[in-house]
């Protein structure tokens, strides 16, 4: 030992060696009690895998937050424990199949213990298009199961639903319907079964491999069994401690973690045991102890290697503990468990293993065999020292070529590929993809949350624009929602569709006007004729009023002067009066009869004008229609008939009539007229005169109005014809716009307010809008593989496009969320990238600092850590060649991070053993120290490497792809580190650097 040895560490292990060698049975008894009694006080790890399952992402992950928001807004269960029942009929789904479907839905709804939510298209018709395949041969029945995903409650619920599905299909006749179970719940159930099924076989194979390798190395059954006893006690104790931590602190447990814990304890524990046995044999050979005094050799070996084993365990354990600060729960839960396992393995290596060596050594059961490999390793050391550049170059070429292959790595985030293709969930996924696009079965959910009610036309229009923009992203197949329930915008809500409908209506109006051209011409002609006749009436009434006024004056005077008994003929001066009365009556009787006949057709005109919307909007036409109504009223109430009778009486006046009789007859007629036209004042001569004047004025106004009517009707007809032409042009334009601008990018969006109250809209609301109206979700289906990196990149694009559509809209203050399995994978990738950086930094710092503390040097730890990194990259490159290039399997995303921690930590073990021995042998000269170190550690490191690699290769028997890949990369990495890096590369570098390796400390001895 050199003077600069770790005095404190040696003192600790010296005292520990004294205790172990003095009371070995006590130490063994304590470990036996721990290994047997401790597991009885805590649940098994298998049980805890269901009580405390591993959740990959933290609760504040964006995808987790989005899922929580959706479940709260729509009052749904926030659970990833989803089972998909796929019902298929290769002959096509028929009525008999639908009967089975209804029966199954009813039975599942009655199973309230296992089923939390059931989504069927019977109770939710808007989901029909999502749940039925386009080929008409498959139905999807999504079910949310009771319990959290991965728990025993979830597993029991899965088994219960699977039983109902199987029983329903078997008990229903007349249907060829088949069922497959898939989805996250089915995948986790298969993983659980596979983990439980694989664990026993893996542990058995590891034990057999260890026995075989130990038998080859030691050729002694007792020596071979000692490490296995130590590993067994360590494993039982470590599992119990991890279980206790899980119960007390809620540490999540998975089957993969249990397998890795077993492998790590087996590998590390065996390494520590091999290191200790090897050094024990060295001291036995050097005569430091005999078979009768094995305790001394054990104590010396423990003092010599205790600090190395402690540094190695600290390196691995602290590195694993550093993983607890990662975000991904796979790392943050596996790390502490593996750290506990390493700590227990270390304690067993420095207490139980020495105690067993003391008992076996004193009986001569573990005496060293003749060192047959020593000469080989010495020759290897000599060659390396003589030609360090050549050996270093050759080893680096191999390592660098393999490391370059690591740049080709492509990660797989599809957990479906972890399990065998023959498992239930894998078969179900394959059947699902044959009938449905993968994106339809695994959609994404875009959530819009606003402080305002989104059930308004403007908000719906803004959301339609947002959804339209998202749908135009390359790789997006469909976007379904309240504004586009079929994946395309509703035709009725597009502005161009509505314009087209208006165009059709205008076209109909134009056509109607065109067909009514003859009626319009007759209307114009009739209005002109009416105006002409009313002009004639005005002239005649003017003459009549003048004549009647004079006549009334003369008759009144004659009656006064001659009395009522005189005849008109007896009055000579009245001759002219009689002639005038006859002429006046005849003239007006004939002309008024003609006018009456001409007025008869006005009724038809009025009926036509009353039904005309255009006349309602035209003031001229409306005024003319009112005048026509007055004429019809006068005709219908007898006013015009009484006037005609007046003319007839005047025309039949005889000279033999007495004045009284004549006046009396005229008065009777006028009284009748007065009854109808009391407003004319014909009930007395004075008023009659004024009324006749008023009549004359009224007729004048009527004639003038008639002319205005005729002129107005002519203008109206011309305007109507012009309007018909304009309507035709407008109709053609709008209909052309409705056809040519029907694409979503040109169609616009308009929601009539009355649409919001329709039954169809209310059904859409239930599926896409939250009850309070403040949250709206859209279903997004992608053309990409939802498990691919391209789909994960698309998630960011969707969010960027959606948020980019918010400014200057009613959604400006809304929050946008995206949920779904692809979003979860995106978060997993993002967290993994950050966690991997953390793991690399923490691991490098921990390994470097511990090596510096152990070797009291800066240079040697730097190239030792560099060699570990190269070894890791080479192992990863070899894994890429085997799985990705040869087997066409992408590496699971969790493998590189876990492999880095294990390989760097294990490589540090061998580095510490090698470097510490170099340091110890430096008193013999640097060149000689390299040769002596290679000779003394070559066999030990090789044996330890083979044992650890065998433990890792035992994982290849797993049916879980991730475990297989991890086992291969770890096993191959350890072999590369054992046979190339520790055997050739590091000794060659040490030989080249010589004294500089220990800078700034000074080596002991000469530079021989």
From Swiss-Prot:
Topology versus the membrane: Multi-pass membrane protein
Main location: membrane
NCBIfam families linked: actII
Transmembrane parts of this sequence: 23-43, 202-222, 225-245, 257-277, 301-321, 340-360, 389-409, 835-855, 862-882, 895-915, 940-960, 961-981
GO CC annotations on file: plasma membrane
Family recorded in the similarity comment: Belongs to the resistance-nodulation-cell division (RND) (TC 2.A.6) family. MmpL subfamily.
Name recorded for this polypeptide: Probable transport protein MmpL10
Matching PANTHER family: MEMBRANE PROTEIN MJ1562-RELATED (PTHR33406), MEMBRANE PROTEIN YDGH-RELATED (PTHR33406:SF6)
Keyword Transmembrane among record annotations: yes
Keywords: Cell membrane, Membrane, Transmembrane, Transmembrane helix, Transport
Intracellular or extracellular location(s): Cell membrane
InterPro entries: MMPL_dom, MmpL_fam, Mycobact_MmpL
